[in-house]
């Protein structure tokens, strides 16, 4: 027996829903039929499509269109016209675009009335040549009429409402030329959309491009492009982000009487020097300028820039202040005032060749000045703490001035080593070398700390005061030191001479002259005052009027310091103060020499004189005394 099966179906849709679906399908079919009917006049005519698209582009932008490839109208998924091998030019020749293809997307409402009205376009692989000094928009275009309309007039209001659209560039390339650019700038891999719906609306630019092999993300907003074309101002926002640069501006842009931006600028880059050198500019200061960050209020034009409220950081240094740049003939000038809590000059000196070579002698390599560029400088900098090589300064105020081939570094004043210093050095930079003039003053500085940081000599202490006035010339550091001329004066008060006990030597010189050599280096010699003068002639400084005094001791010294060959030849004689005050009287004295290379000085006592004073050895020598080289005339001993 076979039982019949009953099939139970689901509930049928309500009549209202079935009607809605039917209406939706019918409307879709009707819309497709309407579109098909509307595009029928264009579907079979390449010439008609090309002419209509060219006419609209000419009407909006003023650009002439030349289409050499196939033109086709595509309905789905979005109605658009596709044309291959198309070119655009403006009448003045300022702009030329050669694109692999053009896709013009049309407005649906216009299409239903039988018209093609392009709302946006895509250019594939456009190759663009842009003359930044030209005016590519003719006056009979939508943009040209809007630009020529007087502000706040009915004509301007009408022109501002005309339709434009959006343009997308896919894998494009642009060559920018201008009298201000040398060489031309090439931008590759351009994938950017420019959305400017009508002249009176804002323009938005977004996308990416490649400059010198590096991809940058670009985002820009211009509130009133047509205002700029009419000579008015417009708010502007721009941001560029790339591996080597992050840059943003927010402010206002004006086009009359010249292009000028006013607003806030932020910039950051791993190497400012590399960025500027790629752009054809040289930083007129040494140093890597790495880890650069800056933020400031700025007024920037083609010929000048003023950066105020500047916060600047690079190479581990941070500054606040103002900078200004002015393009002028024969050289531009960078000026400003900066302040910092801590300034290290080590990064600025990192690329400077060492003064001395590995052999311990002065560097003979010729000076190179090409990296400093041609920009003139007028910079004034104050630093609460400044580190220069091994020297530490406080409350330093200095300036860097450059005018043509002359560079001047001036330290107006600073606290250092419990004293004060100031100085000035001027370099005249030439093709065959450099001329130098230097002056300096130190007042009341700690001689122990200063001599250790300067020369690595810990044997001296006291309060040092001195002046120097020097000049030289040469093509290398070696020549510069060999040609030193000038004078210097040094005074030291309330000090000690380490590594030698002269008072003990004088006390023992008659009793045990030979035995004193064993212990002379174990003590120190205190003094109330010491002084000497230096007279430089061709790199050799004569030590003049050298003396060291305390109530019981007088030391006279003289000799030469060879700055060219880094050598010292010093001769000294020590006497008791009472004996030194009695010229002509034969009194015990202790004589010694210090000589050799600066890096390996040798202390040499007058051994022959000590042996002569020894009673056991006296018969071995002539009775006429010859104790060595006199340092000062006996008549000057008490002076």
Task: Give, region by region, the residue ranges found by the protein language model.
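N-terminal Lys/Arg-rich, disordered targeting/topogenic segments
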Residues: 1-19
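N-terminal Sec-pathway targeting helices
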Residues: 14-31
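Terminal hydrophobic membrane-targeting helix
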Residues: 15, 34-135, 294-298
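N-terminal leader/targeting segments and the immediate start of mature chains
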Residues: 60, 359-376
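Small-residue helix/turn framework positions
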Residues: 78-98, 117-141, 165-168, 173, ...
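A structural feature that tracks compact, well-ordered secondary-structure segments
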Residues: 310, 322-323
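Intrinsic-disorder/low-complexity linker and hinge segments
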Residues: 145-160, 353-365
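Long, internal scaffold/assembly segments composed of regular secondary structure
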Residues: 318-320
């Amino acid at each position: 027996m076979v039982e019949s099966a009953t099939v139970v179906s689901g509930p049928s849709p309500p009549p209202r829903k079935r009607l809605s679906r039917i209406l939706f399908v019918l409307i879709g079919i009707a819309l497709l039929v309407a579109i098909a009917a509307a595009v029928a006049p264009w579907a079979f005519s390449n010439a008609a499509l090309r002419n209509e698209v060219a006419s609209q582009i000419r009407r909006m932008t003023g650009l002439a269109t030349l289409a050499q490839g196939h033109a086709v109208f595509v309905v789905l998924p979005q109605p658009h016209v596709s044309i291959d091998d198309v070119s655009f030019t403006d009448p003045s020749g300022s702009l030329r675009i050669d694109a692999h293809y053009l896709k013009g997307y049309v407005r649906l409402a216009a299409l239903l009335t039988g018209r093609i009205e392009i709302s946006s376009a895509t250019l594939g692989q456009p190759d663009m040549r842009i003359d930044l000094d030209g005016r590519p928009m003719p006056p009979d275009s939508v943009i040209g009429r809007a630009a020529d309309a007087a502000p706040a007039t009915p004509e301007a209001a009408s022109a501002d409402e005309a339709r434009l659209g959006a343009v997308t560039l896919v894998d494009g390339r642009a060559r920018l030329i201008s009298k201000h650019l040398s060489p031309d700038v090439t931008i590759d891999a351009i994938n950017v959309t420019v959305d400017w719906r009508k002249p009176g609306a804002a323009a938005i630019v977004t996308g990416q491009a490649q400059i010198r092999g590096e991809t940058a993300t670009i985002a820009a907003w211009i509130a009133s492009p047509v205002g700029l074309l009419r000579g008015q101002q417009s708010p502007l926002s721009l941001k560029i982000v790339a591996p080597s640069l992050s840059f943003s501006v927010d402010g206002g842009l004006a086009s009359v009487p010249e292009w000028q931006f006013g607003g806030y600028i932020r910039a950051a880059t791993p190497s400012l020097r590399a960025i500027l050198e790629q752009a054809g500019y040289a930083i007129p200061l040494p140093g890597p300028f790495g880890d650069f960050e800056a933020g400031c209020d700025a007024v920037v034009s083609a010929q000048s820039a003023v950066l105020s409220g500047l916060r600047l950081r690079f190479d581990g240094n941070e500054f606040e202040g103002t900078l200004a740049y002015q393009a002028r003939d024969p050289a531009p000038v960078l000026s400003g005032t900066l302040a910092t809590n801590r300034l290290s000059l080590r990064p600025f000196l990192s690329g400077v060749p060492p003064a001395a070579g590995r052999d311990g002698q002065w560097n003979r390599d010729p000076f190179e000045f090409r990296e400093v560029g041609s920009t003139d400088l007028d910079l004034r900098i104050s630093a609460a703490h400044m580190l220069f090589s091994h020297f530490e300064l406080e409350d330093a105020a200095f300036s860097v001035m450059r005018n043509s081939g002359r560079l001047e570094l001036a330290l107006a004043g600073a606290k250092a080593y419990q004293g004060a210093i100031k100085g000035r050095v001027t370099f005249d930079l030439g093709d065959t070398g450099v001329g130098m003039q230097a002056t300096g003053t130190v007042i009341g500085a700690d001689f122990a700390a200063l001599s250790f940081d300067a020369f690595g000599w810990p044997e001296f202490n006291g309060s040092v005061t001195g002046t120097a006035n020097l000049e030289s010339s040469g093509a290398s550091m070696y020549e510069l030191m060999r040609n030193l001329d000038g004078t210097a004066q040094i005074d030291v008060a309330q000090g000690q001479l380490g590594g030698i006990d002269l008072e003990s030597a004088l006390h023992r010189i008659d009793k045990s002259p030979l035995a004193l050599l064993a212990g002379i280096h174990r003590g120190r010699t205190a003094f109330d005052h010491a002084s000497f003068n230096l007279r430089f002639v061709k790199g050799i400084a004569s030590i003049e009027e050298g003396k060291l005094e305390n109530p019981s001791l007088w030391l006279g010294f003289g000799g030469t310091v060879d700055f060219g060959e880094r050598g010292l030849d010093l001769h000294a004689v020590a006497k008791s103060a009472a004996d030194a005050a009695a010229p002509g009287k034969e009194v015990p004295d202790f004589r010694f020499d210090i000589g050799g290379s600066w890096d390996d000085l040798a202390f040499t006592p007058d051994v022959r004189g000590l042996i002569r004073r020894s009673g056991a050895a006296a018969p071995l020598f002539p009775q006429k005394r010859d104790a060595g080289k006199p340092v000062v005339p006996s008549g000057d001993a008490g002076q």
